[in-house]
Structure formats: C-alpha cells, structure tokens
Curated annotation (Swiss-Prot):
HAMAP family in the record: UPF0756 (MF_01874)
Protein name in UniProt: UPF0756 membrane protein HSM_1471
Keyword Cell membrane: yes
Lineage start: Bacteria, Pseudomonadati, Pseudomonadota, Gammaproteobacteria, Pasteurellales
GO cellular component terms listed in the entry, alphabetical order: plasma membrane
Subcellular location per the Swiss-Prot or TrEMBL entry: Cell membrane
Family: Belongs to the UPF0756 family.
Alphabetized InterPro entries for the sequence: UPF0756_TM (IPR007382)
Membrane topology, from the record: Multi-pass membrane protein
Transmembrane segments: 1-21, 52-72, 81-101, 123-143
Principal subcellular localization: membrane
Keyword Ubl conjugation: no
PANTHER family: UPF0756 MEMBRANE PROTEIN YEAL
Length: 151
C-alpha cells in the first residue's frame, strides 16, 4: 500500500485538524474516515458514498431525531399544544429549514467546491462563536439564497 500525497489528502488532513481545533467531532470523524478510505483498498467504495452518502446520513439523522419520541423520553403534545402559536411557529421554522436543506442538497450537487468553504465556516463558527454544527446542507441552502443558484 502506498500513501497518496495529493491536494485531496491535504484537504482532508486540514479538515481533521480544524475539526479537532474547533471541537467538531462530526467533521473530524468524517474527514478521518474519508482519508482512510482514500488511502486504502476502501477507495473503491468512495463512489458509493458520493452517490448515497447524503441519503444515508439523512436517514440516520432522522432516526436520531425520532428515537426520543419512540423511547418515550419526549412525549407527543396534546391537541391544545398543537394549536398554540409557538407550535405553529415551530412548524413554520421546520418547513423553512427543510426547504433550506433541499436547496442545499441541490447547490452542493451542482457546486460541490463550495462545500469546503461551508465546512470551514461551520468549524470557525463552532470554535470561535460558540455555535453548534447544524450541518452544511442548511448552510448551503442559505448560501443558495445569496448566490441565487440551486441547480
């Protein structure tokens, strides 16, 4: 096995370091796995991850979000809570964020080079502004509003 020292490997190492410095385990783990895949016999599975990775990630994320409801840690609201203005606002924000995510998927598919900037910006926001890494899909969706392209 020979290691490949190329710009992609350098980018992944940089993302690993930024993830560690920014205390962003999602970036650190993701970049580490991709670096290991790139540098080993697992490289043949990178096209699979490229094609299905976002969908797999969304499925895992959805399972994570629904698990507290299924386990009983989060109770379903009663009918009176469903008609409260805060619930309507929460639903509206949920719809808006889902729309951002959809725009983000389209933008990342048509302009994947922007992903690096989104990841670095997310890491900087986590590291220096006390932010939470909510995900590049939403960031890409918001970016698409500024640059005006989704596909």
């Amino acid at each position: 096995m020979s290691l490949q020292f190329n710009s992609i490997a350098l980018l992944l190492v940089s993302l690993i370091l930024l993830g560690v410095l920014g205390n962003n385990s999602s970036i650190t783990i993701s970049a580490t796995i991709l670096l290991l895949m790139q540098q080993t016999f697992l490289a043949k599975y990178i096209p699979f991850m490229e094609r299905y990775g976002v969908n797999i990630g969304i499925i895992v994320l959805t399972i994570g979000v629904l698990s507290p409801i299924v386990s009983g840690k989060v109770q379903l609201p009663n009918w009176t809570a469903l008609i409260h203005w805060k619930m309507f606002l929460a639903m509206a924000v949920g719809v808006l964020v889902a729309w951002f995510g959809g725009r983000g998927v389209n933008l990342m598919g048509t302009q994947p080079s922007l992903l690096t900037g989104l990841l670095v910006g997310t890491i900087l926001g986590v590291a220096f502004l006390g932010g939470v890494p909510v995900g590049p899909l939403i960031a890409a969706g918001i970016l698409s509003l500024f640059i005006g392209k989704t596909g």
